[in-house]
């Protein structure tokens, strides 16, 4: 498992738009929830003085249930399990979208 502090946006980009590449689990979830990474973006201009460039990830999950913001276990074969704070940010016909921010 990679350390959360060491993860970079580039660790996630190979999984963009791969349905089911991520599985969400956690307390209160009866079974894992499949997520698709739909966006990986830098949050600031590159700053060589920073240990890690801040970035954001947006995942799309099923339309129902809408999961509350909290820490979930996110599993992916290449990054390993990570405990991430996810926030629901929008919902449309395709699903519910969740954001994770890395600073």
Where do the PLM segments sit?
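Short coil-to-beta-strand transition motifs
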Residues: 25-36, 76-82
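A short, sequence-level motif marking secondary-structure junctions
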Residues: 36-43, 87-93
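Short, conserved turn/kink motifs that form compact alpha/beta structural patches or helix kinks used as
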Residues: 39-75
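N-terminal disorder-to-order initiation segments that are Gly/Lys/Arg-biased
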Residues: 2-27, 34
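Short solvent-exposed loop/turn micro-motifs enriched in small/polar/acidic residues
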Residues: 15-17, 65-67, 93
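Beta-strand secondary-structure signal
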Residues: 21, 34-36, 56-58, 71-73, ...
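Short, compact, well-ordered microdomains
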Residues: 69-103
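A general secondary-structure signal for short beta-strands and their flanking turns/coil
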Residues: 17, 30, 52-54, 95
């Amino acid at each position: 498992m990679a350390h959360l502090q060491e993860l970079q946006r580039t660790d996630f980009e190979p999984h963009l738009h791969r349905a089911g590449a991520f599985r969400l689990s956690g307390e209160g979830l009866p079974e894992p929830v499949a997520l698709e990474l739909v966006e990986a973006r830098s949050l600031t201009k590159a700053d060589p003085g920073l240990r890690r460039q801040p970035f954001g990830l947006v995942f799309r999950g099923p339309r129902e249930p809408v999961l509350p913001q909290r820490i979930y276990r996110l599993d992916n074969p290449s990054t390993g399990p990570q405990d991430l704070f996810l926030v629901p940010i929008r919902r449309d016909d395709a699903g519910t979208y969740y954001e994770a921010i890395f600073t």
